[in-house]
Amino acid sequence: WQDLNFQTVELKQVIRQKNPEFIHELNKARIGDYSCVHYFNTHCQKTLFENGIILTATNRKAEQINHDRLSKIPYKAKVYHSRIVGDVKNSDKPTLDELHLKIGARVMVLMNDTEQNLYQNGSFGKVYKLEDESVTVILDTNKTLVTFGYHEWAIENYVLSKRKEEDIEDNHLSKEKVGAFYQIPLKLAYAITMHKSQGQTYDQVNLIPYS
């Protein structure tokens, strides 16, 4: 590890925020300076933003909120069950085995559109139509209707093997497909974890930092 001589780079330019006072307090939080707490406590409100996304500390809390919000939609839920092939552990699963959806439910996309770039992993929308093998969503960003069928997530393990080239033998690390997980690439998105929200920009945020 030491022989690799990695170079450390510190990013100092803030792109997502413009308010210098807000940036200053965020930097305090980043380094663990407790004096920032007063600023945040005096610049927040206790009433939830009606259209703001809820960020939680744990998946369990997010799932609880999503279940509660889904139950308030006056339509019958449709359940999509995952399909598993090969060796797939619970920790390998990118989403739920049972996906409960209703017309009008808020959802997040869990894959990238590599062909038309209409959506990315993390895009939001609302359920427009439910069918046996697919779900149609109207996207927030461009109001486009997109139909999502079952998507395959390949489950891979790393394998260490010997490789010999020109009389030199060394170890070679490669990927090996051991299974596949199939599910509709959507999840309820009234609430998501802070981890899942990284890299996203939101107009309004409701923060629940406890589990």
Walk through the language-model features, giving the residues of each.
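Conserved ATP-binding/catalytic motifs of P-loop helicase motor domains
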Residues: 1-211
